[in-house]
Amino acid sequence: YNGDRIKIQNAEEVISGDDEPTTAIRQKKDSSLRVGLDMLHKGQGDVMVSAGNTGALITGATLIVKRIKGVRRVALAPLMPAETGCFLLVDGGANVESSAAFLKQFAIMGSIYMEKIMHIKNPRVGLVNIGSEEEKGTEDVTEANRLLKEIPINYTGYIEGREIPCGAVDVVVCDGFTGNVILKFMEGMGIVIKRMLKGIFFKNLKTKIAALMVKGGINELGKTLDYTEYGGAPLLGCTKPVVKAHGSSNAKAFYHAIRQSIDMVNNNLVDTISENINKYLSLIHISEPTRHA
């Protein structure tokens, strides 16, 4: 590689996985995570990719890089494998609780991401719920359903858990608690499917021969289920692109996360989110429970 294109910035402190996020960001100013966010804020970089403490990254990005004007909460948005390609999960774990107003904004940001970065025209947006009936779900979910019908995105309505991996929608919207459960469950299922296939095809000589005959399909499935192919989870709603890479990311995962963040810059994702968030805010009335203030 060309060494002139790489600059190493020294950082003496470390934010561990056990550190309390807000305290760590405020006190460990010479940690790589804090130094990187400071550099991004000062314009010494266009994007930031980190595999560090998720909570500290979210807190630091919110406090230092800041939210886009009008955005109430930032959201983690990982790409996940589906039968027909992939979908964006918003929120993947940044906000344990999410009001209807937050869910509405997650849907807007997710829709813009899939259109600008994944080049999906008029992406389908679904809201996670325990059923398809209008009256089902929590107060926040049913109110979000009403709000999403009033804005000009391709909102298809509620989506149940079994429909998510089938590729029924391009953007899956939910609170961060639900989203993180979906994320971890699908990661676990990917590992289980790979193990099951290995167990089936390596039982005996006949199954090994059969494996050779379908090797291409097996490799394709393995690639589909491989999280390193999908880059990281962008932190949607920040004034500059911040991407959370998986904690166990290898070189390939970092490569895709960096490419992903460059695409966010080249396609003016932040500016597009800013323009549309503020435009849609004027279209609807939001009733929000005081507990989320």
Ranges and model annotations:
Residues 284-293:
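Single conserved hydrophobic/aromatic residue that forms the stacking wall/gate
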Residues 53-102, 106:
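Glycine/threonine-rich beta-strand-loop-alpha-helix active-site module
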Residues 3-45:
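Phosphate/nucleotide-donor binding subsite
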